[in-house]
């Protein structure tokens, strides 16, 4: 590869683009104009349209010199991968990044299992309106930057009346880079915005599900309370029946007690009457008893009245016999 082409590859690095503070809002893109002047441009060829997709074999030809024979050979035989020595910007660090082993690649499954969102409230899981608005604003800013500033400037530089094909190729490369970066950045920001919006929608649905769960729990608690009330109502009804039976028994017992007291009152009254009658009867009984005892004494065959009468009769008989 010739020196000029290698220098062009170097200029694609970070030092080829910088902002000059000429105006506050005007972004100036440094092109190879500062390096290549028209009087010493190494390549001259007709102007090529911007919208075409030229191949390396048809875009321009390298002048065959002793310094660029290797580049012309690659150009004639089509595209071939260049050697590492043709890319001075690739160092050992970049090689290590390119040849990174698959074991160092981030594993999404390990990354997802590393986080636990169980203890995080929903309000922290949802994206704030500030974040969503910031993503939208950044997307608008980048679109405005590329679509209204960088891409039109690159197109304007490409369409200049200039016969330097190498410089036009750099302008075209800039234009393609700006378009690619703009499209990819727009898609990425749109994906990020969609992810945040979807996250908020899922958080809202999760809130609705949790609210519905809470309502169902309250309904379950209400149903359980009603069931307990029904069970308690049945028990209360049974208790009321038992209480009614007990009250009936108490009333019956009271009536029995009243009847018993009434009967006992009559018995006491009768007993008093009978006690008075028994006293009179006792007097009569005593007299009767005395009469019987007197009768028994009188009828005693040894000491009774008859024995006395007989004894008197015998004494009288004995007294009368001497007189006769």
UniProtKB/Swiss-Prot annotation:
A GO cellular component entry from the record: cytoplasm
Compartment list: Nucleus; Chromosome, Centromere, Kinetochore
Domain of life assignment: Eukaryota
BP term (GO), one: meiotic cell cycle
Signal peptide positions (record): none
Coiled coil stretches, renumbered: 199-263
Modified residues (Phosphoserine): 41, 45, 53, 59, 101
Keywords in alphabetical order: Cell cycle, Cell division, Centromere, Chromosome, Coiled coil, Kinetochore, Meiosis, Mitosis, Nucleus, Phosphoprotein
Note, other: Present with 1630 molecules/cell in log phase SD medium.
Family affiliation: Belongs to the CENP-U/AME1 family.
Biological role stated in the UniProt entry: Component of the kinetochore, a multiprotein complex that assembles on centromeric DNA and attaches chromosomes to spindle microtubules, mediating chromosome segregation and sister chromatid segregation during meiosis and mitosis. Component of the inner kinetochore COMA complex, which connects centromere-associated proteins and the outer kinetochore. COMA interacts with other inner kinetochore proteins to form the inner kinetochore constitutive centromere-associated network (CCAN), which serves as a structural platform for outer kinetochore assembly.
Oligomeric form and interacting partners: Component of the heterotetrameric kinetochore subcomplex COMA, which consists of AME1, CTF19, MCM21 and OKP1. The COMA subcomplex is part of a larger constitutive centromere-associated network (CCAN) (also known as central kinetochore CTF19 complex in yeast), which is composed of at least AME1, CHL4, CNN1, CTF3, CTF19, IML3, MCM16, MCM21, MCM22, MHF1, MHF2, MIF2, NKP1, NKP2, OKP1 and WIP1. COMA binds the centromeric nucleosome-binding protein MIF2, and to the outer kinetochore MIND subcomplex, probably via AME1. AME1 interacts directly with OKP1 and an NKP1-NKP2 dimer.
Name used for this protein in its record: Inner kinetochore subunit AME1
Species name: Saccharomyces cerevisiae (strain ATCC 204508 / S288c) (Baker's yeast)
Gene: AME1
């Amino acid at each position: 590869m010739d020196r000029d082409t290698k220098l062009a590859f170097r200029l694609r690095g970070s030092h080829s683009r910088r902002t000059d503070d000429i105006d506050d809002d005007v972004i100036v893109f440094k092109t190879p104009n500062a390096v290549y002047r028209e009087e010493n441009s190494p390549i001259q060829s007709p102007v090529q349209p911007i919208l075409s997709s030229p191949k390396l074999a048809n875009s321009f030809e390298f002048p065959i010199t002793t310094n660029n024979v290797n580049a012309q050979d690659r150009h004639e035989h089509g595209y071939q991968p260049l050697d590492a020595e043709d890319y001075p910007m690739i160092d050992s660090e970049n090689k290590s990044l390119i040849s990174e082993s698959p074991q160092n690649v981030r594993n999404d499954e390990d990354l997802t299992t590393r986080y636990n969102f169980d203890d995080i409230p929903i309000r922290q899981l949802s994206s704030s309106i500030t974040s969503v608005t910031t993503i939208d604003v950044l997307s608008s800013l980048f679109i405005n930057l590329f679509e209204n500033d960088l891409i039109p400037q690159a197109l304007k530089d490409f369409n200049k009346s200039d016969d330097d094909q190498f410089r036009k190729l750099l302008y075209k490369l800039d234009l393609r880079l700006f378009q690619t970066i703009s499209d990819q950045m727009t898609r990425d920001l749109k994906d990020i915005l969609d992810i945040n919006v979807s996250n908020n929608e899922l958080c809202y649905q999760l809130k609705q599900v949790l609210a519905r769960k809470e309502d169902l729990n309250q309904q379950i608690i209400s149903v359980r309370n009603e069931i307990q009330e029904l069970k308690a109502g049945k028990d209360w009804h049974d208790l009321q029946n038992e209480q009614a039976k007990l009250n009936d028994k108490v009333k019956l017992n009271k009536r029995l007690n009243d009847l018993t007291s009434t009967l006992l009152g009559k018995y006491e009254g009768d007993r008093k009457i009978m006690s008075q009658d028994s006293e009179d009867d006792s007097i009569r009984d005593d007299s009767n008893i005395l009469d019987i005892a007197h009768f028994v004494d009188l009828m005693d065959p040894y000491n009774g009245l008859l024995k006395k009468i007989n004894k008197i009769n015998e004494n009288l008989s004995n007294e009368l016999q001497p007189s006769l």
